[in-house]
């Protein structure tokens, strides 16, 4: 696999020198063959605002990391955090919390999302840090014609939501405005227990002080047993101005405001999460032989995330706050043009991320703040990169070859910390052989990398301490599969093997580089039984192993076998869906990283939609119909959980959840 770079260069030369006539429109070989697209998210995934929940239901290779009633995280083929890249309208946003309370997926709500495209593997050269996968979130686009909709949603556990969207414009200018507000009480598990009741049952009235065992145990339960689980408000605005038929300017702003988000598995909750995403883009087409399409893009994002113990009994008289802030800005210029019957894309990509954090104590009676300490010194991660991509068709064979060179500086404001710089050349080759319209084979090999983040290098706060000697992680991966249609039956199996060098792993006290491998397969498809009935199916299985002499050789956060099955019945203006999400027993886990065995489970969900009137739509649904008690998420030590003795507290997922959504559109 280490010959990927030279193979990529040879393949590029072959493509540019080939004389066979090709289709010079954008082939998007990787996106066509090696991606999963979840469409109409705002229309279909209306249960709640949680994008992670929607993705885990629709993409077999994605599993949810549930720690709250909202703002949950995802694992893609055994990878999460910085090992996968998440873009929102081509902008990068990172969470502020080192404990993953506010992952990137939490900074956009499903009611604002049009489509999500998931590209598995290292087949992305346009964006910084795509190690093992790319999740591209596309929000709603403005329209010329005047459109709008209002949604009212209610569900179990006191869930209430209202959202509204309007869009319209002219041939020259289009504008979209969307806003939403929602709140929920604590969900109940299959036993009927709320967050607070689970805390009491699991012994969180007396959590030992792991930092100082000589100190008395703390009461980490909620002061108010009926504390709301969260409140959330969002705004999305988008505008497009068409300068000419071949050029336009686009701008957008996304705001997320979340308050008092409860994380019952830990000892702190989020006081608030405030985030903003700004984007500005200019596109011009047909400038001449050297520019089929030229794109100039800029984005800026920022997050303010304070978490504290003030909602817990441990913080009744004085509470601790850990406040983290992060921001990122990026610029990209990309040009596509034709050379030797090939479509060539070249570009420059730069970005700067800042991350910093501090902790302090507040006296409830007086409001006095004391003990301010820096937990993460202000750190800039500056990336500069050049990339290129060539796409070409040779009859039935479509090829895409890409390469990217990165130079990254990581600079800490703490003069006692060692600044780091990293450079890397990454490349991939991906091909699709189209036997006919109903059968295609695809395969790819690639090398990618990602640098350590500020927490992994320099953190002095809670949990594992930073290690400034970390190297960047390299991924050498191969993927192969086929896509076959037989009448109304479609099947798409894929195999992958990923060799990870200098993989960044949390040892409990610090971070270290290890070598490891992840491999697996997934199968997806559908079967249209007739004009009314259809069956969607998908399954994913992956395993992760450490290389070397370790007490436990299993990698952490490698979910077990998972299957998604759905039977749909459509007639006139109605659609009925019965869905099963089944997960095998989690019996291969890293006990040395504080994971534990989890029982398997199968959930049965029902959903009904009806277009009652041309302007009015109704959706009814029940998730976890049989009120199962289950756990979707393991207790890897990269996240701080409350511990009772040697056992980390394991929280149950939601029990039976019913919901109704009424939509008025015009």
What name fits each language-model region?
Residues 64, 92-120:
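Short acidic/polar hinge/loop motifs at secondary-structure boundaries
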Residues 107-149, 665:
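A beta-strand signature from Gram-negative outer-membrane beta-barrel systems
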Residues 257-259, 302-306, 361, 366-367, ...:
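Surface-exposed extracellular loop regions of Gram-negative outer-membrane beta-barrel proteins
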Residues 268-290, 323-328, 375-381, 417-420, ...:
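Outer-membrane beta-barrel signature, preferentially recognizing the C-terminal barrel domain
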Residues 392-399, 408, 490, 495-499, ...:
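Gram-negative outer-membrane beta-barrel transporters
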Residues 228-232, 246-294, 301-326, 379, ...:
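Flexible loop and strand-edge segments within Gram-negative outer membrane beta-barrel domains
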Residues 156-183, 194-259, 274-286:
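Transmembrane beta-barrel wall of Gram-negative outer-membrane proteins
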Residues 190-191, 501, 587, 610-666:
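C-terminal beta-signal and adjacent terminal beta-strands/loops
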């Amino acid at each position: 696999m280490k010959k990927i770079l030279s193979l990529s260069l040879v393949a590029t030369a072959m493509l540019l020198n080939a004389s066979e006539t090709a289709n010079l429109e954008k082939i998007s070989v990787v996106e066509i063959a090696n991606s999963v697209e979840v469409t109409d998210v705002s229309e279909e995934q209306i249960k709640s605002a949680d994008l992670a929940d929607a993705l885990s239901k629709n993409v077999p290779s994605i599993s949810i990391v549930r720690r709250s009633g909202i703002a949950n995280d995802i694992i893609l083929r055994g990878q999460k955090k910085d090992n996968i890249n998440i873009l929102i309208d081509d902008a990068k946003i990172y969470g502020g919390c080192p404990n993953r309370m506010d992952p990137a997926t939490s900074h956009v709500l499903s009611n604002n999302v049009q489509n999500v495209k998931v590209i598995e593997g290292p087949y992305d050269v346009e964006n910084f840090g795509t190690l093992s996968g790319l999740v591209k979130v596309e929000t709603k686009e403005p329209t010329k014609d005047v459109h709008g909709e209002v949604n009212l949603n209610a569900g179990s556990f006191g869930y209430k939501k209202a959202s509204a969207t309007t869009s319209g414009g002219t041939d020259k200018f289009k504008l979209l405005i969307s806003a939403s507000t929602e709140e929920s009480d604590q969900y109940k598990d299959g036993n009927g227990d709320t967050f607070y009741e689970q805390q009491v049952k699991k012994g969180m009235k007396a959590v030992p002080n792991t930092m100082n065992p000589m100190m008395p145990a703390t009461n980490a339960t909620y002061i108010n047993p009926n504390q709301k689980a969260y409140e959330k408000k969002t705004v999305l605005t988008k505008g497009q101005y068409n300068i000419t038929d071949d050029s336009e300017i686009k701008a957008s702003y996304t705001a997320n405001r979340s308050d008092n988000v409860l994380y019952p598995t830990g000892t702190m909750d989020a006081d608030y999460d405030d985030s903003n995403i700004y984007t500005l883009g200019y596109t011009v087409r047909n400038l001449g032989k050297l520019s089929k399409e030229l794109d100039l893009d800029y984005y800026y994002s920022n997050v303010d995330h304070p978490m504290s113990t003030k909602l817990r009994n441990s913080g009744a008289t004085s509470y601790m706050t850990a406040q983290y802030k992060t921001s990122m800005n990026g610029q990209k210029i990309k040009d596509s043009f034709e050379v030797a019957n090939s479509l060539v894309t070249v570009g420059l990509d730069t970005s700067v991320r800042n991350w910093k954090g501090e902790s302090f104590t507040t006296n409830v009676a007086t409001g006095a703040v004391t003990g301010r300490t820096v937990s993460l010194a202000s750190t800039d991660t500056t990336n500069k990169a050049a990339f290129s991509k060539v796409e070409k068709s040779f009859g039935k064979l479509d090829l895409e070859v890409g390469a990217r060179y990165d130079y990254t500086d990581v600079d800490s404001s703490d003069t006692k910390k060692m600044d780091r710089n990293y450079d890397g050349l990454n490349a991939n080759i991906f091909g699709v052989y189209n036997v006919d319209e109903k059968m295609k084979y695809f395969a790819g090999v690639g090398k990618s990398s990602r640098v350590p983040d500020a927490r992994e290098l320099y953190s002095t706060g809670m949990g594992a301490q930073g290690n400034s000697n970390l190297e960047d992680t390299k991924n050498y991966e191969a993927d192969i599969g086929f896509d076959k249609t037989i009448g109304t039956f479609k099947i798409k199996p894929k195999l992958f093997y990923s060799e990870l060098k200098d993989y960044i792993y949390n040892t409990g006290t610090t971070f270290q580089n290890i070598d490891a491998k992840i491999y697996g397969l997934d199968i997806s498809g559908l079967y249209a039984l007739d004009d009314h009935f259809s069956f969607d199916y998908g399954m994913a299985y992956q395993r992760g192993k450490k290389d070397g002499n370790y007490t436990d050789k299993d990698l952490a956060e490698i979910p077990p076998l998972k299957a998604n099955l759905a039977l749909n019945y459509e007639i006139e203006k109605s659609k009925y869906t019965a869905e099963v999400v089944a997960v095998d027993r989690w019996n291969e886990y890293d006990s040395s990283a504080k994971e534990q065995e989890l029982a398997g489970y199968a959930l049965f969900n029902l959903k009904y939609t009806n277009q009652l009137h041309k302007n009015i739509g109704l959706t009814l649904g029940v998730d976890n119909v049989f009120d199962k008690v289950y756990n979707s998420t393991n207790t890897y030590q990269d996240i701080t959980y409350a511990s009772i003795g040697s056992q980390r507290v394991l929280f149950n997922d939601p029990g039976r959840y019913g919901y109704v959504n009424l939509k008025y559109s015009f």
